[in-house]
């Protein structure tokens, strides 16, 4: 079955309403262009590295106003939407980074909490300790789309190939990798890692991304990608905000897996 996927690329701020408006505008444009499934990047609702700001501005999961707005958008347009990642407050001092899949009726059908925390030292001036603010998720998430199974992940998960192998072996033919990759690591690894995950699992990869220089001077890499199961880049947005669109053939992963039956030989 063929369908159209859109990945939205954003330069999010620390203002939730501002980010929501950007997503709504680009989602509407993507839908007019034929998108049936729309994905947003990591940190879609709020972009901040400040733990106090995150805890002050983030809501819990229940009755979350940002999520409810996205549900209304999905229901009104009758389209599937993946909130790629957003901070959810789970205690007075901790959050989770949650990806939320919404069906065309506006119902939440699956959530995934980012499992691998981005705790890295890239240089003396660029360091990240995600675990100081966030709790890691404990299990993978697989969702049933109308076109096949989706394996959900977020950003730094991309560097852990066994996670994707497991999801592919459980029947996933689509992999979502919403991200806010740093410019530093993105320039070196982004394309290679995403194409590797697509090729080794014969799965489509949908990777919406944050881009540019944000209000807090953090730089994200952009280059949102839609990649075929044989590693071909079907669509890419190198920089700037907006969206990319590609037609997806849900029968292709199985065709490739039969030609090269490597998926179940390890």
Regions found by a protein language model. Name each.
Residues 83-85, 98-101, 141-143, 224-226, ...:
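Short beta-strand scaffold segments in enzyme catalytic cores
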Residues 90-170, 183-185, 192, 255-265:
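Active-site catalytic loop in hydrolytic enzyme cores
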